[in-house]
Amino acid sequence: MHFDLTSRSLEDQQQTVATALDLGGRHIDVGQSPDEEHVVLADPEGNEFCVIEPGNAFLADCGFLGALASDGPPPVGYFWSAALGWPLVWDQDQETAIRSPRGGPKITWGGPPQEAKDGKNRLHLDVAPAVDGDQRAEVDRLIGLGARRIDIGQGDVSWVVMADPGGNEFCVLTPQ
């Protein structure tokens, strides 16, 4: 899971990259081809993110944080669309994306994982039922959509750790 940051111009993209490098980021190679226009970086803790080229139509109206991108086949996108009640805004070429009806960044999935999973996810989503909601009912609803409970060694905690159909961990919190 990583962030896609957008750019208004080539200079803006270069400035975002320079700022990230000044803050301890570094260039990384994830198999991108030399002719790709986006820049792949990692933050000081090794979390990947991309600085997308200007003029990217897919992320054009999403804001600076264009997307939260993750590996995963189409069923993962279908699951999250149903789980969050957000419309599927892209379903093409083994890639899916959802977006809040209110706008903002997209959440995207595309293809199989590029690297084998090693331990728990470094980044994950938290789902919080409404204040008057019920955690158990939300867990049951998500299981009905294709999620499953998992144990990652969390012990006795107030949240429930689950995995989506692609094996990505997420937590269901107590009502907030």
Model segments located where?
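Hydrophobic "anchor" residues on beta-strands that sit immediately upstream
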Residues: 160
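Short, small/polar residue-rich loop motifs at catalytic or cofactor-binding pockets
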Residues: 34-36, 155-157
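Glyoxalase I/VOC metalloenzyme domain signal
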Residues: 1-29, 42-93, 98-151, 163-176
